[in-house]
Amino acid sequence: MLLDDKILDIFGFFRNAIEERIRAVWSGDNIPESLFKRIIVGPPAQPKHGDLYTNAALILGKFDKKNPMELASTLCNAFENIEGIESINVVAPGFINFHCVNSVWHGVVRNINKLGREYGRTDLGHNKKVNIEFVSANPTGPLHIGHARGAVFGDVLSNLLKWVGYDVIKEYYVNDAGSQVKTLVSSVFLRYKEALGEEITIGAGLYPGEYLKPIARDLVEKYGSDLLNASDKDEIIRSFTLSSMLNLIKEDLALLGVEHDVFVSESDLQNRNVIEECVKYLRERGIIYEGVLEKPKREDELSEWQPRVQMLFKSTEFGDDSDRALQKEDGTWSYFAGDIGYHFHKISRGFDSMIMTLGFDHKGYVSRLKAAVAALSNGKASIDIKLYNLVNFLENGTPVKMSKRKGEFLTVRDVIDEVGRDVARFMMLTRRNDVVLDFDFAKAREESKDSQIFYIQYAHARIRSIVRRCPELLAIEKIDFSCVITEQELSLLRLLSRWPSVIKTSAENYEPHTIAFYLIEVAEAFHALWGCGNSDPSMRFIVEGDLHTTSARIYIAIAVSHVIASGLDIFSITPSEEMR
């Protein structure tokens, strides 16, 4: 059986083959597994160096205290019989480059056409449960556009992990027990009076947003003026307003294509004494004590510090830089106590793998949350906290004012109205999540290469167009892909062969933006190959009078469309069948 008939992940195959032969060469020595994790097998930065390379000689040279160039020569001898390798060469300071026979890349076309959109899918997760908490914005107003980046990141990461075999729960933590909710209730009551015809003045510290007016009108419609003197008006307004605000947030998220599986209420956890249970559990394990915190060195933590005896969590025993207070001076639970109780609740629900997204301004919470999860689970559970940075909104390079009028900000609805859901989702993933993102509305609206999602969709639509124009193809089993020999064609096939590795790496590192980068690269490579046909008719996808070459190239195009469609599916973006 030929290699091209059985290998679905080319780079995975070569990595395994190279690692196997390294172990054979060092059969008498114990090479630490950590070294193998540092060995790279992948495409070189410059295609002229070969189809793939490895840094194995450099990594193992340090371990074995041998000259990397000499070690590389030894390894070359061991690698010579790897199936699919045409030639091997060594370059300083010890890199090993490989050139593959063309049939390796031809096999990629066959396999993608056989698997369709399933190409690249793996069972990396083995159905392991993962809890991904994201957005969790305070229910005091509609979603600010700053939340959209975290929403899209969390949603696409959830899709990606599901795609590789994880059992994912998408969760939203409703912060409905803090002082901001009391302020919200006071603000709505004021608007309620206004809806009844009273003149009002919005005091300092209250929420002035126009979005509260419909809630106030709904209260009037349901209760008339009865709430003005009702003893339980605060609880009625609180319950009604939080329900309304949560529905508003869900509607905004739906505009982005985001839907959570579970909403967990902070006040519900408090009413069920979850924090008390958590504190009892930690106290029994000797992880809580009464003491005075040292004065913090960090400026941003000074406002929370008080030189008094209080209930403290031994956070430093679990990697944090300071122990943490669990109660305020008035005896109520601290913000951190609420967080630690919430994660106690997650663990009690059977989650030992958790992911959480936070705005970059919350980076100080990372170490304390990791410490909390380690303490609560006795080191058996883990939490990964992904920080997302700011979004700068621009119009032709000029900053867009975030504040449109008093109390109102650029919202998710505003952005979706401007560019549409698919464009907004993709744009949010065109940079690493922890890097500031420039979102230019003018570029997003363009139907050109400057709009990356348009360029990707255009590639998919072009392919669907040529497939419709050429319905009669030879069966792929009958095609000899040896006619596919130009560098432009082969480089596109090499790129497609990377898709399984891109998926695996993106999922392992929780970095969905790498899929966006890859899809852009695939679209560019396809359009470049298409462009070759403009100057050279023999390079066109449909070659008049040559059904064999035409079929081979259209199967390549179909392979491209499957990969693009798979990537867009992970982004919850519908691939375009035609451009209008």
From Swiss-Prot:
One of the entry's Gene Ontology molecular-function terms is:
ATP binding
Under the heading PANTHER family, the entry gives:
ARGININE--TRNA LIGASE, CYTOPLASMIC, ARGINYL-TRNA SYNTHETASE
The protein's name is Arginine--tRNA ligase
**Keywords annotated in UniProt:** Aminoacyl-tRNA synthetase, ATP-binding, Cytoplasm, Ligase, Nucleotide-binding, Protein biosynthesis
Q: Is Metal-binding included in the keywords of this UniProt record? A: no
The domain of life is Bacteria
Kindly give the SUPFAM superfamilies that the UniProt entry links to this protein.
Anticodon-binding domain of a subclass of class I aminoacyl-tRNA synthetases, Arginyl-tRNA synthetase (ArgRS), N-terminal 'additional' domain, Nucleotidylyl transferase
Q: Which PROSITE patterns match?
A: AA_TRNA_LIGASE_I (PS00178)
**Pfam families assigned:** Arg_tRNA_synt_N, DALR_1, tRNA-synt_1d
Which protein family is named in the record? Belongs to the class-I aminoacyl-tRNA synthetase family.
- Subunit details: Monomer.
Where does it localize?
Cytoplasm
